[in-house]
Amino acid sequence: MFIFSLSYLKPISQVEKYLQAHIDYLECYYQSGHFIASGRKIPRTGGIIICRAESHEKAMSIIQQDPFYIHQIAQYELIEFVPSKYAKGFDNFI
């Protein structure tokens, strides 16, 4: 499992230009079962995506499809972890 931590490199006005394309990208990976949750950071300096992927390479290939990545709107920190304890029902996502 992976956490994608996005930090904006551009002003919000630039982020907004690519926001719909980013939302479409998110929806694609929710439909494929890769994305579990996502949302904005508070304050709005970037976002977080929780992703299920079989390898670091697959997670990177998913990141590289994001319009925010393609247009250098955000930088990404990729954090891999193994959930060892989780809430009831979360096992559906592991």
Feature locations, PLM:
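Conserved, structured core segments of small domains
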Residues: 1-94
